[in-house]
Swiss-Prot record:
HAMAP family: PfdA. This is Prefoldin subunit alpha. Its main location: cytoplasm. It is found in: Cytoplasm. Gene3D superfamilies: 1.10.287.370. One of its GO terms (molecular function) is unfolded protein binding. Heterohexamer of two alpha and four beta subunits. Pfam families: Prefoldin (PF02996).
Length: 147
């Protein structure tokens, strides 16, 4: 079909499929980051609960991947420093910290759900385009066999 007839070209379909594939990959990377953030919040809340229980020692990761742990002793206190966003932190009591973390987790969970919805739409559109491209390829193969 030509552009003049209101259709799209094969090259347009291929370009759209390529764009959607890259977009889906980007959404999946972002989704993974959001899930990692949720897991980090859960870990932070567990640490607060450990502090609240009166435990004076805790194992903490020294690096992000968990290659090195250190036992930290002498944990005393009823306050922790919580990340509020951007470059802002606040020292708050343990219960307030849990409330802040719960709110942040809810925000991230909503963002993850919205992202998942967008990912499903993009994947559906991508699959439709791939189906069309496969049909075009099969039709071309049949025509070539008929020659």
């Amino acid at each position: 079909m030509s552009q003049g007839q209101g259709g799209i070209t094969l090259d347009d379909l291929i370009a759209q499929a390529d764009y959607l594939k890259r977009y889906i990959d980007s959404l999946q990377r972002t989704q993974l980051e959001l899930l990692e953030s949720i897991n980090s919040i859960d870990s932070a809340k567990q640490a607060i609960e450990t502090i609240k229980s009166g435990n004076k020692e805790m194992l903490v990761f020294i690096d992000r991947k968990g290659y090195l742990l250190a036992k930290v002793g002498g944990i005393v206190g009823d306050k922790v420093t919580v990340h509020l966003g951007l470059s802002y932190y606040a020292e708050v009591d343990l219960d307030s910290a849990i409330k802040i973390l719960d709110k942040r987790k809810d925000e991230i969970s909503k963002a993850a759900q919205n992202l998942n919805n967008e990912l499903q739409k993009a994947a559906s559109t991508y699959n439709q385009i791939v189906d069309i491209l496969n049909q075009i390829q099969q039709a071309a193969a049949r025509r070539q066999q008929g020659e």
